[in-house]
Amino acid sequence: MNQTQTNKNLFQPGDLALLIDRKERRYLITLAEDEIYHCHLGRLFLNDMIGSSIGSWYRTDKGHVLLAVRPTMGDFVRQMPRGPQIIYPKDLGNIVNFADIFPGATVIEGGLGSGALTSALLRAVGNTGKVINYEIDESVLPKAMRNIERVTPDTSNLEIKLGDIYQGITERDIDRVVLDVPEPWQAVSGIGDALVMGGILLSFVPTIIQVQRFVLALEKDGRFQMIESLETMLRTWHVTERSVRPDHRLSLIHI
């Protein structure tokens, strides 16, 4: 195994690490030399983790053990510092899939939020694609960019425009448009001008009334075909040797 391959399996300064305790509680940290992580389980000296293998166990000064792994994007999204309402991992996967975000695509995104959806889109378009984000609230940019850069350090293919997507889109021949805005029906006309023939528009909204208004606006515009409204449900299960039953929480998404 070469040195590059070896380093991929070792924690380095600046890496994100996910600590998991015996009760499967999770703690997201950034590794830094000569730093100490404090929690209710005790102190953990981060120098002990740097240079060691991912997937190792570490003991705090109180005797508690923690498993350290690389966080998935879903882990980071659940733990990320938040401003506006966040889109969770179950929704991100559906959005990328149903919008058919592909490597090399040029994607317009309406709304930046905490940066979770932007990060997922950047991953999906790859180095040869581009994400152009329209955000009206300048105050969300610093926190969102910190989140995005922790997941996708190379943001050279991300362009953020401080502007109102309801007022129109200047770009043309766009492959995909993904909206996470309160009133997506207000953006329909401008998106119709921007999308390439055969392009896809997807809007994520939390209520069925918003779905109805959006669909009616698409139909009235007349340039959009194959309009679909989707609701997906995600339920986790509690599985033991003695019983199998669904968990009590159920998650919904409207597209």
Go through each PLM region and give its residues:
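Conserved SAM-binding loop of SAM-dependent methyltransferases across substrates and taxa
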Residues: 114-126
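A short, conserved alpha-helix within the catalytic core of class I
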Residues: 184-190
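Conserved small/polar residues in nucleotide/adenosyl-binding loops
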Residues: 253-255
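S-adenosyl-L-methionine
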Residues: 136-172, 176
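N-terminal auxiliary segments of SAM/dcSAM-dependent transferases
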Residues: 1-67
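Conserved class I S-adenosyl-L-methionine
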Residues: 104-113
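Conserved SAM-binding motif I beta-strand of class I
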Residues: 130-135
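C-terminal substrate-binding/active-site "lid" region of AdoMet-derived donor-dependent transferases
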Residues: 190-193, 197-249
